[in-house]
Design a protein with these regions (language model features):
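Acidic/glycine-enriched connector segments
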Residues: 2-154
Length: 154
């Protein structure tokens, strides 16, 4: 078990229809990562269906094993009207300065890159060779991050 937190970011395409395919797989993977790494900070956006789905899986695991070894952090590209709702759901909310100061059309890309830079492991669901999730996954590969694409296991 490590003494410092392992940081894991999760992202995928905006539209996600792989619920049945990855439900058990994602649940099992997250539990294994917790067992292997001790305390984990999960960095996750809120801009796509995979983000929301992944957060719900992590919340389910937190209810099952407790919250002492995990922190679910919502990383927003900029302030939005739902931030109070998010504050009641997530353990913490972050808005990276690099994203907040960029043009709104570029803020999600900046946020995704920031999450990749901050994390040790990337867990993603990327099935197309285009879009923001694909670009973030490629960025993670370029930085030498450990990347687990759930599509590859199906």
């Amino acid at each position: 078990m490590k003494n410092e937190a392992c940081r894991i970011c999760l992202f995928g395409h905006r539209n996600f229809d792989g619920y049945r395919v990855v439900d058990t797989q994602l649940f099992k993977l997250i539990k294994e990562l917790i067992d292997e790494n001790g305390f984990i900070e999960f960095y996750i956006g809120r801009n796509g269906e995979f983000d929301v789905y992944s957060a719900s899986i992590i919340k389910k695991i937190q209810k099952e094993i407790g919250e002492n070894n995990t922190e679910l952090i919502c990383v927003l590209p900029y302030y939005n009207k739902d931030i109070e709702f998010y504050a009641n759901y997530y353990d913490d909310i972050l808005i990276p300065e690099v994203a907040e100061k960029s043009h709104p059309k570029n803020a999600i890309t900046k946020r995704n890159n920031w999450m990749v830079e901050m994390c040790d492991i990337v867990v993603c669901y990327v099935e197309r060779n285009e879009g923001g999730a694909y670009c973030a996954m490629q960025y993670a590969h370029r930085l030498g991050k450990k990347v687990i694409n759930l599509v590859d296991d199906n």
